[in-house]
Amino acid sequence: MADAEVKARVEQVYREDSRRILATLIRLLGDFDLAEEALHEAFFVAVERWQRDGVPDNPRTWLVSAGRFKAIDVLRRRARFKASRPWLLAQVEELEQAQWSDDDVEDDRLRLMFTCCHPALAADAQVPLTLREVCDLTTEEIARAFLCAPATIAQRIVRAKAKIRDAKIPYQVPSLSELPERLDSVLRVIYLVFNEGYSASDGAQVVREDLTREAIRLGRLLMELLPEPEVMGLLALMLLHESRRAARTSPEGELILLENQDRTRWDAQLIAEGGALVERALTTRRFGPYCLQAAIAAVHAEAPMADETDWAQIVGLYDVLLRVTPSPVIELNRAVAVAKRDGALAGLTLIEGILERGELQDYHLAHSARAEFCRQLGRTDEARTAYARALELTRQAPERRFIEGRLRELG
């Protein structure tokens, strides 16, 4: 195989499997930083070895093995320099005898997720740590999701890693009796991963398919472990949103708003699966925020045309959702639904009230929504100002182009 082909294959494996491999190395090594070092060393070696020997039949297993041996070398060097610490040699022996299978590599991401969401960790560190280690989001991407400073996120992640190492927090999926109390954090992580994939906060594309696929895969794994209503609701929500992926952008990569999408391009199979999960979850009458959001998505999916959407039902569902989970972002979404039901002025009044409280001043979608309703009402100067503020806050290229187009239309 030519050098360029090998390098391309290594890059592909890194994109698709590096976080799975890292999760297994963290389980084997019990040390995030050592596992990260071993991972990168393994991929570095792969470029040379695969050019010489060919790409192995199972690249993931090969890379786990290579990473393990690199870690053993590091630990042996540490043991020589720290002869007074015999536990290092014991760690080397334990690592040399460690066994794993390719199935472990799949399951280890779920194990790592539960470890990162362990109740012994600070609540404000659990989700950022999981997004960083399990899903490879950067601290900047995580900070944007939490509307806070990257340095703050980085500090939380460092402290959480140290806590896992020092407290020897177990690397395992909890027992069935422990699962329910550990569920909320894990659901939140999967939801944030999907959201970052469904509407990437940065970059040249609207969607990051690697993240949406991974979130759905983890949701399905969680359903097998614990088929609770909120697990069903989250999986349904992701499937219903994913069903619209093909229609959300033009062939040129331009953003298409929901009301302008070609609904014949929506995935009927995903809609059917998601809708069935919503019905199943709601019949339990033990539903929460994910079930309610999935129910809203299902109402959208049921409408054959945008102007046939049951906005009254959607507003009603948002009313219930706000009682269950008060949130300014949910208020914003409800305001948009109210505008669809009662007119742009009704929605704009609600959005301006939210912005006056200051909670969404740095949230680009709030300013975009305000701009759109000002535009519809002929308040051109206000629309232009709001779109300009949204543009300042937007990093994703298709969203920026969409806003720039609106500004050009306004003159």
Segments the model singles out, each with a brief description of its role:
Residues 2-23, 33, 180-188, 192:
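A short, charge-rich alpha-helical start-of-domain segment used by transcription regulators
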Residues 13-32, 45-49, 114, 118, ...:
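Amphipathic, Lys/Arg- and hydrophobic-enriched alpha-helical face
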Residues 23-24, 28, 38-49, 62-74, ...:
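Amphipathic alpha-helical interface segments
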Residues 32-51, 57-64, 86, 135, ...:
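Conserved RNAP core-binding helix
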Residues 68-86:
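Arg/Lys-rich amphipathic alpha helix in sigma70-family domain 2
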Residues 78, 85-124, 130-141, 148-319:
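Amphipathic helix-loop-helix modules that constitute alpha-helical solenoid scaffolds
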Residues 239, 298-302, 338, 374, ...:
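Residue at a conserved register position within TPR or TPR-like alpha-solenoid repeats
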